[in-house]
């Protein structure tokens, strides 16, 4: 039986709305599929917007934790108060493009990815096994077309969406290594390496990787630092409350 780990990280966005989609596309709730999560949460934020610059919904109340326990049935989960990372890399953070994702949001994501994959690794070590496939994704991911069974994917590769590069990727030179930050999967060892972006961030920044997008930093860590074999796919999906459909 193929064993799969779904690893959620980030803010608890659109969890109820995307539940069935994740059941249909990733087997959420099946006996061979386990859930791990590192989620930012502070009940004081209930009802406020996740972000002020783009519409991503509002922070849920504490009842979401009970819902997650009853429906996701996570093997391990950590809720952490949102942290600020603005104090990091104040002198050598180099976007290299006129529009940039907030540094704090980017580093927060790298931190969460590392934390949730570490939870998965702890469970593997405690039970002396490795998952066949590990999926790292946002809670508000909504697939429009089924990506196919995970067993069809080579577990020795990192699987990501095939982004058509825009001028920002082309002119900054990141088109050769950048990978979309919304979702990725592969074998357990592959995803362990994928998750080391936060650990390797000082090295990545010192080597002058453009920092205007987390796609560049994640890809730099995967390809330049960890030498992962990356395979890109023409999946079709969107962020639940977003207007953009990702497709080729």
Question: How does the language model describe each region?
Answer:
Residues 19-20, 121, 144-154:
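Short alpha-helix within the catalytic core of nucleotide-sugar-dependent glycosyltransferases
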Residues 11-16, 43-44, 142-144, 190:
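Short acidic, S/G/P-rich loop/turn micro-motifs used as interaction or catalytic elements
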Residues 1-17:
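N-proximal low-complexity "stem/linker" segments adjacent to membrane-targeting elements
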Residues 134, 140:
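Short aromatic/hydrophobic "clamp" motif used to bind/position activated sugar donors
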Residues 38-127:
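Active-site-proximal specificity loops/subdomain of glycosyltransferases
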Residues 103-119, 123-129, 142-146, 167-174, ...:
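Catalytic core and acceptor-binding pocket of nucleotide-sugar-dependent glycosyltransferases
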Residues 20-33:
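Short, acidic, metal-binding catalytic loop of nucleotide-sugar glycosyltransferases
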């Amino acid at each position: 039986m193929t064993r799969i780990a779904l690893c959620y990280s980030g803010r608890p966005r659109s969890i109820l709305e995307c539940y069935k989609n994740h059941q249909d596309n990733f087997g959420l709730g099946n006996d061979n599929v386990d859930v791990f999560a590192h989620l930012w949460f502070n009940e004081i934020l209930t009802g406020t917007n996740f972000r002020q610059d783009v519409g991503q919904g509002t922070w849920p109340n504490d009842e979401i934790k009970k819902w997650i326990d009853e429906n996701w049935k996570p093997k391990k989960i950590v809720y952490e108060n949102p942290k600020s990372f603005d104090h990091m890399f104040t002198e050598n953070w180099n976007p290299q493009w006129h529009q940039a994702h907030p540094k704090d949001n980017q580093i927060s994501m790298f931190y969460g990815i590392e934390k949730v994959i570490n939870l998965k690794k702890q469970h593997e070590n405690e039970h002396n096994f490795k998952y066949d496939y590990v999926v790292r994704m946002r809670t508000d991911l909504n697939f429009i077309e089924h990506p196919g069974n995970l067993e069809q994917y080579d577990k020795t590769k990192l699987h990501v969406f095939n982004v058509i590069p825009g001028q920002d990727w082309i002119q900054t030179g990141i088109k050769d290594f950048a990978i979309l930050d919304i979702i990725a999967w592969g074998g357990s060892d592959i995803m362990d390496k994928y998750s080391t972006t936060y650990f390797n961030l000082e090295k990545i920044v010192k080597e002058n990787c453009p920092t205007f997008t987390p796609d560049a930093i994640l890809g730099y860590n995967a390809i330049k630092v960890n030498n992962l074999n990356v395979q890109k796919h023409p999946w079709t999906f969107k962020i639940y409350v977003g207007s953009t459909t990702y497709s080729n």
